[in-house]
Amino acid sequence: EDNKDKGAFYTPKEIVRYMCQESLIAYLETNTSIAKEKIRQFVLSPEEGVVGIPEIKKPKLLAALEEVKICDPAIGSGAFPMGLLNELLHCREVLSGEHYDRAEIKKSIIQNNIYGVDIEKGAVDIARLRFWLSIVVDEETPSPLPNLDYKIMQGNSLIESFMGVDLSKLTYEKEYKKDKGEISLFDDEKNRLQKTVSHLLSSYYSCSDHDRKVKLQQEISNSINKQLEAQAYNPSILAKLKEINLAENNK
């Protein structure tokens, strides 16, 4: 009854799998030069379909699978991302040959490919737990679980503001700076900050030391703030951004 009041409904596994497979097929058709029918056969049945993939194109196919980005804006209990985790895992196992670590492939997919948001904290906790359990079942020796704080987050994906800051206005910054002849400098700074954030997030994902995690959270917060400030040419937006501590809001 509570789920109905919130507009939350259970999606049958068959529907989840169908949607995940069709999404993956559409992505691979767009990002590889492999024939559509061969892509479809491969995704629907990797062990049989891989036979029709030319050897010379398999590295490109594997790279596309490793680079895909998936975001569920209303993740709920994580059914759709878990479905895509299984589809990606199956495809990558077949392309990896005989020597591969199933748990490590799962960790790689969760770290590099999957993101999710939900307005309900309980849903976020359940989704994170499902991903952790999916790793544990394939590990012979238990290892520290990855930190999913920046992978699956609580928030409202229907609005474009955070802590009173209208983030939609930041998208106009590039055009604004282009008009002022500052685009090259802006792009260089943006790329540098993006690389810094990516490096920090990668370190945080596998960090198990509490003090180090707290320090990394603050460094991530500072780097993201700098990136947002670089885009905020409006003085009022800039002032609001400086008041936000992302590390505190992520706890």
Each PLM stretch: what is its role?
Residues 5-251:
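SAM-dependent methyltransferase catalytic region
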